[in-house]
Amino acid sequence: MALNLQDKQAIVAEVNEAAKGALSAVIADSRGVTVEKMTELRKSAREAGVTMRVVRNTLLRRAVEGTDYECLKDTFVGPTLIAFSNEHPGAAARLFKEFAKANDKFEIKGAAFEGKIQDVEFLATLPTYEEAIARLMGTMKEAAAGKLARTFAALRDKLQEAA
């Protein structure tokens, strides 16, 4: 079905708005994936705070102009599914990576974060805010416990020398 000019402008504006508010973007080719599987992916995306859209490449090129995702233009070949992470930079990459494991025909073309093309593995393995805080707290706790142990050992050595 051919789109009229107003529809095309609305799509470009909608995708551009999503791109401006997104933390990262991932591009994929979903050719050969069943409708049921795509529906599951879309549902998972909504739950993860990811905005997904299938857009014509020419409209997508116009939509990402002036955004951090202009670097992805070379990946806009063939059927293009774009996903924007709104809550966590790795959400879309993690979602697509898991989906690609279960669906052979789903191909991830590229990802961008902070205006640069990034490896999908890098984005998918980024810790969430809660995970990062937990790691930091673990490191701080470990350092404090180590310092306490060294202090007690030094105190013990000093007392043994005095005796």
UniProtKB/Swiss-Prot annotation:
This is Large ribosomal subunit protein uL10. SUPFAM superfamilies: Ribosomal protein L10-like. One of its GO terms (biological process) is translation. Signal peptide: none annotated. Pfam families: Ribosomal_L10. GO terms for cellular component: large ribosomal subunit. Forms part of the ribosomal stalk, playing a central role in the interaction of the ribosome with GTP-bound translation factors. The keyword Electron transport does not apply. The gene is rplJ.
